[in-house]
């Protein structure tokens, strides 16, 4: 009888442990995320009102949330400030390809920025950006362009540097080289018009870095 009780107890314990192993806490708060919410320095995402109420420090503003799995379940947030004008390629070097995809439809700014930062000669715009951030691709800049109005309203509340959406001569570097001339041309982007143009890599333009946040989509 003792043996049977021992075996039954052992089986119960195993089943209990198995159920614990299979239960993983999933944070489903991302379901409520939307453009205009604040990414805080502690990693939390919330409305500006909640951020201020809780005494958190805003770091970036969400401008796209991939609820449909279009870009592998990511959210994008844009920095509260511009980064200073720099060249795409070191002006003291000759022109050469820098290892980006050159794909204007790809959401690969992070990969592109890594290539620019760690290529044989580091790109000035990549070196200028905090390692936590990356320079958006053409496709990612388009997402920012589409959300610029709501993003700017929250940037203003956070005391950040507004996106220049009414300046025709204001351009930002993307991290995408031009497929037709990757050695000496890369794409610049206007948040005023949503237009992008090829530019000489030795040209000076600002960057507006972004971060990506992986959504917890397993629940």
PLM-predicted stretches and their roles:
Residues 4, 20, 135-138:
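Conserved structured core elements
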Residues 1-18:
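Sec-dependent bacterial lipoprotein signal peptides
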Residues 20-130, 201-219:
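Short, compositionally biased
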Residues 80-83, 190-194:
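Secondary-structure transition/turn motif
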Residues 193-203:
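Carbohydrate-recognition loop of C-type lectin domains
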Residues 8, 67-70, 179-181:
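Short, ordered beta-strand-loop transition motifs
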Residues 113-134, 138-191:
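An exposed tryptophan-centered "aromatic clamp" motif
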């Amino acid at each position: 009888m003792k043996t049977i009780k021992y075996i039954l107890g052992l089986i119960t314990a195993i089943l209990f442990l198995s159920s614990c192993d299979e239960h993983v806490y999933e944070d489903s708060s991302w379901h409520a995320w939307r453009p205009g919410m604040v990414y805080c320095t502690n990693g939390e995402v919330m409305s500006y009102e909640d951020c201020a109420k809780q005494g958190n420090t805003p770091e970036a503003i969400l401008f796209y949330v991939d609820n449909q799995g279009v870009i592998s379940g990511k959210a994008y947030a844009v920095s509260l400030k511009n980064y200073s004008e720099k060249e795409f390629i070191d002006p003291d070097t000759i022109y050469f390809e820098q290892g980006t995809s050159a794909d204007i439809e790809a959401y690969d700014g992070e990969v592109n920025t890594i290539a620019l930062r760690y290529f044989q000669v580091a790109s000035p715009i990549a070196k200028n950006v905090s390692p936590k951030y990356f320079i958006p691709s053409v496709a990612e800049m388009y997402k920012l362009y589409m959300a610029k109005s709501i993003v700017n309203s929250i940037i203003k509340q956070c005391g950040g540097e507004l996106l220049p959406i009414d300046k025709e001569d204001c351009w930002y570097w993307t991290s995408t080289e031009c497929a037709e001339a990757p050695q000496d041309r890369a794409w610049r982007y206007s948040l005023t018009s949503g237009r992008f143009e090829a530019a000489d890599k030795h040209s000076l333009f600002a960057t507006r870095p972004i971060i990506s946040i992986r959504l917890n989509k397993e629940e």
